[in-house]
Amino acid sequence: VMLYTVTGLKRVALDDGASRLYVSVDGGMSDNIRPALYKAAYTALVANRRPDPAAGMTRARVVGKHCESGDILVRDVDLPADLAVGDVLAVPAVGAYGRCLASNYNMFTRPGVAWVRDGRQGWVLRPETLEDLLALEGE
């Protein structure tokens, strides 16, 4: 499961008269390149709270933080209409290749890998920091 924090929301009119909510998140093609490379299809759901059923659902597309038109993590998904900046989206079944295919594209840091068992949790690999990236720079 990959967890993303919602960083922005924008409703866009479509040619068919409908609309789609674009949901930008704090990750993208640098931590999950599979949708861009292989057209891998995922879904997403709100993980940090129970959405209000009265709010209904809305057609959405989850996009990453990179300046690339192909940075689409979830192409089409119904998400709660009361989705807000700061909400956490869970993208299940991203597979084991997320970390090994991850990159520092655009100088973004790679996410950590966590373990959870019996109510306990910890890092298998901690998230990278900007200091980690800068430590690799030459003189």
Give the location of each predicted region.
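Charged (often Lys/Glu-rich) extended helix/loop segments that serve as interaction or gating elements
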Residues: 1-139
